[in-house]
Amino acid sequence: VSTYVYGITRTPAPPLPDGLTGVGDPPRPVRVLERDGLVALVSDAPDDLKPKRRELLAHQQVLAQASAERPVLPMRFGSVSQDDATVGAVLAERAGHFRERLDALEGKVEYNIKASHDQEAVLHLVMADNPELRAMSEANRAAGGGTYEQKLQLGEKVAQAVQAREGEDAALLRRALEPLAAEISEGPDSMGWLANLSVLVDREGADGLLAAIEELGTSAPQLDLKVNGPLPPYSFVEKSDAAADATASAGAARAGG
């Protein structure tokens, strides 16, 4: 039976609720594998695992339970090894890397902050800040709305100003977070967001981070800020080759089997 890996932490094994289950239908019981002072949180791997909502939530729930009181290196959803022995071998082979990253994550949690513009507020802002745009808009109004070409030209200028403001406000958000963050990771670009930042912060400093985000939302009302956390530090595992090596070794072992 293949082994599904949720995350890695130090011994002793974290206290897990009785009957904790993970992925699969029916859900597989979660167990621990220990090697060289490290613990892998695992279960049997289902044969037909798909990234359905229930499975993703089960993966996250195991990590949430395990990381309540200590750092855990979270594996990405779908990390499967050939068997328990292969997981143990990876723990032994990469022990130094895992310990180094666990040290870096000690007492820390991740928050994800996404920012977008309130369209009405940002349009008001760029018009107020740009005399040329105001003059063009007023000229169009005085001419009964302006010609099609004039409207198109104004629209293009406004779009350029809004795009420039997106860059400015993305930098503004990062500057607000940097003094409070141990590390910042930029997430993938996605439509609708001008910034997608993950922040590694001391657990005790989380209130300060949230207060700074709230203050920014007040001082920059054109920003719509969405905060998610605390989360397992997914975004900061990949900065070390530790978790990547574990997953790659597991995948190679599975392919070889």
Locate the predicted segments by residue.
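An interfacial alpha-helical scaffold signature
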Residues: V1-G257
